[in-house]
Amino acid sequence: MSEYQGTFKRYEKKYLVTQQQYNALAKAFAARMVPDRFAESTISNIYYDTPDFRLIRRSLDRPAYKEKLRLRTYRTPGADTEAFVEIKKKYDHIVYKRRIAMTYSEAQAYLDGGAAPEQSQISREIDWFLHFYKGIQPAMCICYDRLALFDKYQPELRVTFDSGIRWRMDDLDLSSGSAGDHLLPHDTCLMEIKIPGTTPLWLARVLSENAIFPTHFSKYGAAYQTMLRESRSPQFGSETIHINEKGEIYCA
């Protein structure tokens, strides 16, 4: 396995960005934002949940504390591709992420009831999570194309752009590829700003000048809500997700 960061503690702010806004950001970022380790990649995730979707239902209520478990790869995996099993928690607006790396086949076996390839504090936390949430199982596949940047003058500041966000609930095996139904309009991407403290003044100014405002958006949550609407309305397949100027999602 390659070297990787296993723990994160930071604020994460999300923004839904149009193509025009993205172009303006690209110009503003050119002098100081550079690609990170993964640069451009297709990220594939399997989110785990209980049969009644207890985790995502609670998350959508926006409680003070919430958590989720996912399996992640940075390309369509083979058996020996590096994969990450991650617990992501949010408490009082701070995000805590803890993850362990292993091969994709090892991750599948582990999450199917096996033992972690190596024991650690993080693996014990994941073991507890799997034990606590009875019946937890693969629930949804979410994939997207990511551009990941960091500030060369303030390396702890990271900005990611996720486009082509797609989801599926069948064939929950990342080795099957990244196909799925698209979640957002084609000209909209999700930008996330990840930083240990407050947003730098220069970045806040860029966001303000381009009328880019934070929003509450969860890929898994939005896909789950879409799934519910589809299951309740046979006509939903012809509807389109729209986003207003505040970043709120509605269908029409």
Q: Model features per residue range: what roles?
A:
Residues 1-252:
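Phosphate-end processing signature that detects enzymes handling 5′-triphosphorylated RNA
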